[in-house]
């Protein structure tokens, strides 16, 4: 990398001395592009040399193995060890060849990514820079076109690297891969104060996860509302049972039987004592005749029936007794509307999610 930078320095100095109208940012961008292109060319040359040497060795080993297989049987016993060693070498070289092909594919992918990033940097710089003259405008409107110099033709001889020594040839491809430079704070534009290009990745699974979470919350809410309604119905049932249960005094009266002087006839004393006890316990009704008491009881029964008719749910037809408060009856009626609102809300949320997903797919 340093050698390539040293080679490109005279070119950059000559371009700056020629009196061009490029801004400092465009000069830095051009310098970075030249450095990247020179690095890619040198790497391709090294890989081509290594592939050629491996092919030559493979060819030599194939010829040697074919000669050893075509020899007479008299010499087979003496050269068995050599044949086995040659076959082992052939298999090892084949493995190395496959490894090199994988590394070549990796480097080509890295070069493609590097080229896209450099083209994006050039486009951003051209959009941000203000045109100073017509020449600068024409230069900014030009798109970065990929050259076929080092793919179809031999590279420039003035830019070639010197021949490597035998010790340097044994370097692995991992030492020259671009992945080693990925841990730095900035990528290629770091030494030249260029902006780092951020890769925007779409996350289509985010909408699916959000929809799943909303569905789960809706199910939990629906279950909680259902449990609340069941608890309220149980509470109303208990209230009705408590209201219908007689008071302890009335229960004692029904249990207590009148005294019998004879097994068949009741005594007047027992009846009079019962009436006195009843009148002493119900002091509020001492001055009212029995007919008036019967009328009051009938009116209460009619009022309870009217209240029961008034407390009939218009949605499900459930009836509530007079002992149930009006607030409980109102909450039961409101529950029907809350359930309908929840269903509408869930349907609208699902429609919005599908609409969001369709827009996201269309924009992509």
Swiss-Prot record:
Residues in UBZ1-type zinc fingers run 310-336
Coiled coil spans: 32-114, 210-243
Assembly and oligomerization:
Forms homooligomers. Interacts with the dynein light chain ctp. Interacts (via C-terminus) with IKKepsilon; this leads to phosphorylation of spn-F. Forms ternary complexes with ctp and IKKepsilon; this is required for spn-F redistribution from puncta in larval neurons and for dendrite pruning. Interacts with ctp and IKKepsilon through distinct regions. Interacts (via C-terminus) with jvl.
Q: Which residues carry this modification: Phosphoserine?
A: 53, 85, 172, 202, 264, 270, 325, 349
Q: Name one GO cellular component term.
A: cytoplasm
Its tissue distribution reads: In pupal bristles, localizes to the bristle tip throughout the elongation period (at protein level).
Name the positions where Zn(2+) binds: 313, 316, 332, 336
Q: Which gene encodes it?
A: spn-F
Q: What's this protein's name? A: Protein spindle-F
Organism ancestry: Eukaryota, Metazoa, Ecdysozoa, Arthropoda, Hexapoda
Top-rank taxon: Eukaryota
Organism of origin: Drosophila melanogaster
Q: What is the effect of changing residue 172 to A?
A: Abolishes phosphorylation but does not affect interaction with IKKepsilon
Q: Which CDD domains match?
A: Zn-C2H2_spn-F
């Amino acid at each position: 990398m340093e050698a390539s930078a040293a080679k490109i320095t005279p070119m950059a100095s000559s371009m700056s001395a020629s009196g061009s109208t490029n801004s400092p940012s465009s000069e830095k961008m051009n310098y970075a592009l030249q450095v990247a292109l020179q690095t890619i060319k040198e790497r391709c040359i090294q890989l081509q040399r290594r592939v050629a040497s491996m092919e030559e060795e493979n060819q030599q080993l194939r010829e040697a193995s074919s000669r050893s297989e075509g020899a007479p049987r008299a010499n087979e016993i003496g050269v068995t060890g050599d044949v086995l060693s040659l076959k082992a070498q052939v298999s090892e070289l084949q493995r190395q060849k496959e490894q090199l092909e994988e590394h070549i594919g990796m480097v080509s992918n890295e070069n493609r990514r590097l080229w896209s990033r450099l083209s994006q940097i050039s486009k951003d710089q051209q959009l941000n820079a203000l045109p100073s003259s017509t020449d600068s405008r024409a230069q900014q409107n030009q798109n970065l076109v990929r050259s076929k110099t080092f793919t179809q033709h031999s590279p420039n001889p003035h830019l070639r690297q010197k021949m490597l020594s035998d010790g340097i040839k044994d370097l692995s491809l991992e030492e020259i891969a671009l992945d080693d430079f990925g841990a730095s704070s900035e990528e290629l534009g770091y030494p030249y104060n260029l902006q780092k290009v951020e890769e925007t990745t779409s996350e289509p699974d985010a909408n699916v996860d959000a929809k799943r979470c909303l569905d789960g919350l809706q199910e939990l809410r629906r279950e909680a509302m259902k449990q609340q309604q069941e608890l309220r119905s149980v509470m109303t049932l208990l209230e009705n049972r408590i209201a219908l249960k007689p008071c302890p005094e009335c229960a004692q009266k029904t249990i207590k039987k009148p005294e019998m002087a004879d097994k068949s006839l009741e005594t007047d004393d027992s009846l009079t004592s019962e009436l006195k006890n009843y009148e002493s316990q119900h002091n509020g009704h001492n001055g009212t005749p029995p007919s008036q008491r019967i009328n009051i009881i009938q009116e209460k029964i009619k009022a309870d029936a009217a209240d029961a008719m008034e407390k009939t749910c218009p949605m499900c037809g459930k009836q509530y007794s007079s002992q149930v408060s009006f607030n409980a009856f109102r909450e039961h009626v409101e529950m029907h509307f809350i359930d309908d609102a929840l269903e509408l809300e869930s349907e609208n949320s699902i429609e919005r999610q599908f609409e969001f997903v369709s827009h996201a797919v269309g924009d992509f």
